Amino acid sequence: MIWQNSARLKTIIASASTAAALLCAWSLSAPRVAVAQHFKPSAAPVTCATCHNGVATSYATAPMRHAMEPQGADPAMNAHPDLTAQIGGYTYTVKTRNGQSTYTVSDGTGALTLPIQWIFGQHSQTWVLEKDGHYYESLVSYFPRANGLAITPGDQKITPHNLTEAMGRRLPIWETRTCFNCHGSGVTPGEKLVPAKVTPGLDCERCHAGSRQHMADAVQENFKSLPKSLKRLDSEQISDFCGQCHRTWDTVMRNKWHGPAFVRFQPYRLEISKCFIGNDPRISCLACHNPHQPVNHTAISYDVKCLACHAGAKTASTPPNAKTCPVAKENCTSCHMPKVDLPGGHAQFTDHYIRVVHAGEPYPE
């Protein structure tokens, strides 16, 4: 997210293109003849969906595909055409009309209005605004839980002295690039960032480097070049891969971040769990989450994942790999991965630090 300054470090998978997430599955299991018949001169332009229609259709509704929305395409903005908040001495108004959204801040004597071109986030939303060639993170964001506007997390201590400062926090170049790179596709390392050329949301190439070349080769019936497959990564490498945007233990430690505000950094929290073993595929981001599908929020749906380790009585041939829970056999995450209120974020995040939770205990670092 763009809510905190950060250095995205970790180099275990430095050859991978930066991503927060894991997008389009790549498995050419069909015979070459069956695949090649897709690529006829009269056919529509080749896309990932040409061969991977099932995955592409599912991914169209996945959160990462909508990590950033262009104006006019965002359901939340269209469903809330008028948003207003009074914060300090400033009034904030967000209006959406005919697919166009504007962001206005006024102090009673003057006003500043800018178009909202980039909408970051699928649920809670922050906007990046452009003024005089510089980019700003909106000082207020939209929160469904609050059903309105509130201060953007991380910006609570900002005291604006004029309309421009009240509009939002000016982003340094590196942070602007990071924001667009983790919420969009097409940011080229080493080149000047041109937000207008960034594709909103994460496309297949973002996690499966080489997919564009693979499509170009497939048109020529050359199937030797394959895009990056995340199936070959172990649990620690997957955590680092996702953590390029969702943050890793290394990133948090280097920045000396502390407190419940960082519960939203799932790879970091998962890595400090006692049961996290870097080479065990049963506990990893992909073991519980299919990035090509919407997130399943029901606790019981994750029980089978937990029971992959914590199940069964000990026998001579199949000893259990971990202790079984003496309390319950279902809704494991409701006790061992509690939801934590994000300070100032008007939202709850599941704490991925897997542990035995004791009532009333302080937030564990």
What are these regions (language model features)?
Residues 37, 55, 169:
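Ordered, soluble secondary-structure elements with a strong preference for glycine-centered loop motifs
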Residues 38-53:
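Local sequence-structure signature of Cys/Sec-based thiol-disulfide redox active-site neighborhoods
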Residues 1-37, 151, 247-264, 281-283, ...:
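Post-cleavage N-terminal segment of exported redox proteins
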Residues 130-139, 143-177, 185, 189:
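Extended acidic/polar, glycine-enriched regions
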Residues 46, 54-120, 126-128, 152-164, ...:
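Primarily the internal scaffold of c-type cytochrome electron-transfer domains
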